[in-house]
Amino acid sequence: YNDPIFNEFGAEKFKINKLHESKFIEEYKWKKDSQVLGKFEINKWTSDFGDRTDWEEVGEIGISYSLKYARMYGGDLQGIKEKIPYLKELGITAVWLNPVFLSYQNHKYGANDFRHVSPDFGTIRTSGEKHGVEISSQNEHGNKSYVEVLGIDAVDNSEYKLLEINLKGENKGKNGYGETHDPSTWVWTESDLIMVDVIKELHKNGIRVIFDGVFNHSSDRHWTFNMVLAEGSESKYKEWYKFSDFTHHVKIEDYHSDQEAYEILIENKKNVKYNGWAGFDTLPEFNTFNQEYKDYIFNITRKWMIGPDAIESEDWMNDDGIDGWRLDVPNCLENQGFWNEWREVVKSCKKDSYITAELWGNAAGDINKGNKFDTVMNYEWLKTTIGYFINQSSEGGRRYKLKASDFFNELREKRTWYPYQSLQSSQNLNGSHDTDRLYSRIINDRAGRDLEEGKQLEQGYNSIRPDLASVYHPNTTIDWKNIQIKPKDILKLISIFQMTYIGAPMLYYGDEVGMWGATDPYCRKPMLWEEFTYDEERNPSHVNQGEVYDQKADKDLFQWYQKLIKIRKENSVLVYGRFKEILNDDE
């Protein structure tokens, strides 16, 4: 992992294949509002991101909430497979997939079930196919496919319904596949098999795959959390979470109807007390000291790394398991010793596996002992790079000049933080799903993450297509119209540095074709594809909203990134060589 070119994306916004769109609408359970249930629809891929659909209007959902958590565009794993030639043409050699596990959220950073891929990414209704995937009868983390388990019911069955947990009765605590937390009961669903097929195809094309690991918390619909809501303090899963009060809990009994059980579940969620990540009751925190919880996550890790064939291939390009993990908010786990144990599991699955952590700031304490993470998402590299090339204040307000000497000094200091091997494999990112788009940051005086999350546009952030800043520039101290250098030129300068510095360059999906936007959710628009014709976008900024312009992929920028990646690959000194600064002056 010293020489990858990373690409980050999630299936939901990358490419829609449309094989199951109508079935998705029919099956998807959005329980926000009874009115919305009858109106739910997939948002048009090529629409203006700011437009509301009928179901959003009827449900009276605030637009920013809907954009972040509720609306769906229908991107799927088949779409990723279809675009593997595109990734290969660009020069990508590793992909970080945003969460793929079962979740009703569009971003899936709160999982309902880590055992399985979300049906909206795979298939909504089963087909009876195995997608060319072989499953070992000796696999300790699932030795059967859904076809063997369901028999004649393996065709045209609802995968969503099969994954629902039984809250009462003789099958209490099991889903439609008969699974429990015991890995010997686990089954490979059709969506799981589709995911494995995509992994294998990416590997065949020289592209490694890392999953997003979100192990600090689950969604409030995770099956173990729901079992606690159903059973109360008697539940064997109670200690998996941080519950503190069951005083007003009502136990779900076998004599309750399904509707009564559901209503009790909802009331229990309101009445019991538990810790939620960052105060969100929709994201209950795990008790990471609990051994059964740890074993569950360790077995999840083994399932997806070893793959259905249960062996580590000598050649990773022939392997059917993932190659590593990107860890979400790993510093939030109360039990930091969890990561030491988890690392041993990962490295026992694959010797050349890769573990990168979402850590902001100096993370030497988590990297340098070699017993937690291999490396980091290098936000500190991005911060210094932006400070020099964009000359942007970290506190907001007017731009200031970060001198060349200061730029070099910051880089030099940050290179001392980690061992050289960790530096070489650190993800030098130009942005992510948590930041505003780099292209948009260039034309703004304040970075999106410097403002209250979700409030950038209200506070004057300009989210117009950046190449139009020379015509329209209300929120910048630079007069783009009357200077020779343009936002795209600065973007290209940054890309040159990114592709020639120590570390693993990482592109956020669509940056290579000039995608723009403020931070979440506006940095998470559907991918711009050259073959699609998009509706015009109305500037979503809260100033001069009347500006309307085309949405289109920038082919010139794609070719630019393609050329730079090729240069990096053909010159190993850019990957393995030492970095030395040559300072001219600070003018």
What residue spans do the PLM features occupy?
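N-terminal structural segment of carbohydrate-active enzymes
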Residues: 1-200, 204-208, 223, 295, ...
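Short, solvent-exposed turn/loop segments enriched in Gly/Ser/Thr/Pro and often Arg
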Residues: 1-2, 96-107, 213-222, 328-333, ...
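Glycan-binding loop/region signatures in secreted carbohydrate-active enzymes
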Residues: 3-68, 223-295, 449-479
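Loop/helix patches that line or flank the sugar-binding groove of alpha-linked glycan CAZymes
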Residues: 4, 8-32, 37-53, 361, ...
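Aromatic- and acidic-residue-enriched segments that line the glycan-binding/catalytic groove
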Residues: 6-22, 27, 105-129, 141, ...
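Conserved, mostly hydrophobic/aromatic
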Residues: 87, 97, 114, 202, ...
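Polysaccharide-binding and catalytic clefts of secreted carbohydrate-active enzymes
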Residues: 100, 165-167, 180, 228-346, ...
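Active-site-proximal helices and loops of the catalytic beta/alpha 8
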Residues: 198-199, 203-207, 216-217, 225-232, ...
